[in-house]
Curated annotation (Swiss-Prot):
ATP binds at K10, F58, R86, T92, R104, N114. Belongs to the NDK family. GO terms for cellular component: cytoplasm. It comes from Nocardia farcinica (strain IFM 10152). GO terms for molecular function: ATP binding; metal ion binding; nucleoside diphosphate kinase activity. This is Nucleoside diphosphate kinase.
Length: 139
């Protein structure tokens, strides 16, 4: 079954020149890039995207980080796209939990500055794609 997922290359990935590397890994995995856009994230979009973390102590720094520079947003499609990208990304903590060979394992150093975001469920993917690509047809 074909699935959709939202992927963000966060400001640290963009500023470090890793966009091409991340997109190449996505394509080598066999996922289709159905939509792609470089954008400066508004405070409003950041707060909507990370709404589930609003009551957590790191929320303010998370919003500050994601709005600190351009982000590459993409919609990926493919069989088990959500799990496939999350495997490619590696664990959230790039030093302790991300396997070597994953994006975070190879390039990440800190939990907050972990280069990429990928939707964690079909429900999250639908919500996130609707936020980042309001005109895009969500499956």
């Amino acid at each position: 079954m074909t699935e959709q997922t939202l992927v963000l290359i966060k400001p640290d990935g963009v500023s470090r020149g890793l966009v091409g590397e991340v997109l190449a890994r996505i394509e080598r995995k066999g996922l289709k890039i159905a939509a792609l856009e470089l954008k400066q994230v508004s405070d409003e979009l950041a707060r909507e995207h990370y709404a589930e973390h609003a009551d957590k102590p790191f929320f303010g720094s998370l919003i500050e980080f994601i709005t600190s520079g351009p982000v590459v947003a993409a919609v990926l499609e493919g069989p088990r796209a959500i799990a496939a990208f999350r495997q490619l990304a590696g664990g959230t903590d790039p030093v302790e939990k991300a396997a070597p060979g994953s994006i975070r394992g190879d390039f990440g150093l800190e939990t907050q500055y972990n280069l990429v975001h990928g939707s964690d469920s079909p429900e999250s993917a639908k919500r996130e794609i609707g936020l980042w690509f309001p005109e895009f047809p969500v499956a």
